[in-house]
Amino acid sequence: LPKGDFPTVSYPNPEAPEAFALGLKLAKEKNADLVLATDPDAVRPGVYVKDAKSGEYIPLTGNMSGSLLCEYVLSQKQASGKIPADGQVVKSIVSTNLIDAVAKAYGVELIEVLTGFKWIGKQILKNETTGKGTYLFGMEESYGCLIGTYARDKDAISATAALCEAAAYYKQKGMTLWD
């Protein structure tokens, strides 16, 4: 049965390396490509990726995982011809400028909002209210992201699923998420 006090970790935070101790141990035993964790309310994903060259597991920062997911989501939309002319990527003002480059590469508008995911949610609402702009992806440096508009807050469940999908996609191409 699940335990609400999370007895397997001292601090259930996907930004904290100690939250991955058991997962990393098992990943090494099984030769896994990824180790994923979320915070208790499943809004922030954490990920370690295996470096195929060294065999080491490397943690991705929120900026790194957000950038990787943004690029993957947009690449898949582009491949299927589903990037709308008014497509948008939304990020908090303290998030990496790599997102700017990804958005530009796919020809979508970059919207910068204040720190806090509620501002990303408000951009989605603004788009829906005005009928202008199509939200595609949003992220903040503190490990939060949202793919699509089904929610107004960050969602680690869809993010971890997308990370697994991206890992499988790149593995078929002979690459890891670290590559």
Predicted regions and their residues:
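Phosphate-binding chemistry for phosphorylated carbohydrates and sugar-nucleotides
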Residues: L1-W178
